[in-house]
Amino acid sequence: MRKSTTHSLIALGALLALTAQSPAPAATPAAQSWCTRLPLPRPDLPAMKVEGNPVHRGRAAECRVLEVRAGRTMLRLAVAATNAQREHGLMNVPFVPAGQGMLFAFPGGDELRGFWMKDTITPLDMVFVRSDGTIMMIAENVPATKPGTPDDKIARRQALAKYVIELGARESERIGLQPGMQLYIEAVDAK
């Protein structure tokens, strides 16, 4: 009896030591996405890594956070710079905090970029931005998609752009974004 109690206490102590060293669940992105757990980490901290991410077929994935100046407002945006990241976007993200969102960066220059709200469960603003940082168009309050919505009923928007920024619904109006406004976006190596 005494031996099993001692072994149980040792095992419990080891478990507690391991738990104390593990990061808190809120400090890591959601397992189903590479970088869509919001709010985003501060951009001056190292990129977060997620092991076993299904979007990246088991490889570690990085979440790059970029600050983009929009007038007097600084936005903190997760960067989607690969096809897999752009394809996943903000799917299944229940809430986008004020001043945060996602920057979709594309290779090449300004082209017609089409977006849809497949599996996007919160309404969004889509800000289409040219390669020189000029806002071309803002699609405000694009409706969320309910589970089971047929593809032909899912909201879609498109415009000429190199970058597309997704923000929470009505956020572009709140911070004063307008077509023709200049944003300051650091170069992104899009693939």
Located regions from the model:
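Compact, glycine-rich, soluble single-domain proteins
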Residues: 27-191
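Bacterial N-terminal signal peptides that target proteins for export
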Residues: 2-11
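Cleavable N-terminal signal peptides
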Residues: 13-14, 24, 58
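Hydrophobic helical h-region of N-terminal Sec-dependent signal peptides
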Residues: 10-18
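Boundary at the C-terminal end of the N-terminal hydrophobic targeting segment
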Residues: 20, 24-26
